[in-house]
A protein has these predicted regions:
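Nucleotide-sugar-dependent
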Residues: 1-4, 12-30, 41-49
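CheY-like receiver
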Residues: 2-6, 70-73, 96, 100
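A short alpha->beta transition loop at the rim of the catalytic pocket in nucleotide-sugar-dependent
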Residues: 8, 36
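Short alpha-helix at the nucleotide-sugar/activated-sugar donor binding site of glycosyltransferases
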Residues: 33
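Short loop/helix-cap segments at secondary-structure boundaries that form the rim of catalytic
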Residues: 48-52, 81
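Conserved acidic donor-binding segment of nucleotide-sugar-dependent glycosyltransferases
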Residues: 53-65, 72-76
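A charged, aromatic-enriched C-terminal amphipathic alpha-helix characteristic of glycosyltransferases
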Residues: 62, 75-106
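Non-catalytic membrane-proximal stalk/linker segments that position and tether the catalytic domains
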Residues: 107-112
């Protein structure tokens, strides 16, 4: 994370040619957020979810078309205004996953 912390902006450009990629949560995006660095991201649903109100600034609709102009337009104020999204710990993520499995199993059991 030390090298990432030294960056003004990170890039998280994922080709979204298949559903698996479009629904992914890229490690590079999470590393940038953990370092407190904004990431210019491909139009991934998880990037939009984590960025919330900031998604319009940091998610590129068409990275191939928009990357250069997005990089050229970023100001120091944009970087300073960036609010790092809350990233769940492994334990929090595991607890939510376990709860989702339990709900699915309960639902399945009641529909038999």
């Amino acid at each position: 994370l030390a090298m990432t912390r030294g960056a003004d902006v990170a890039l998280c450009l994922i080709e979204s040619g298949c559903l698996s990629h479009r629904l992914s949560t890229p490690n590079k995006m999470m590393e940038a957020f953990a370092a407190g660095v904004p990431a210019l991201c491909s139009p991934l649903s998880e990037a939009r979810r984590y960025l919330g109100d900031q998604a319009d600034r940091w998610v590129l609709d068409d990275p191939e078309r928009d990357l250069v102009s997005a990089l050229e337009s970023i100001t120091r104020e944009d970087i300073e205004a960036f609010t790092t999204p809350t990233i769940p710990t492994w334990e929090e993520g595991a607890a939510r996953l376990r709860e989702a499995y339990e709900r699915a199993l309960t639902t399945r059991a009641t529909h038999r």
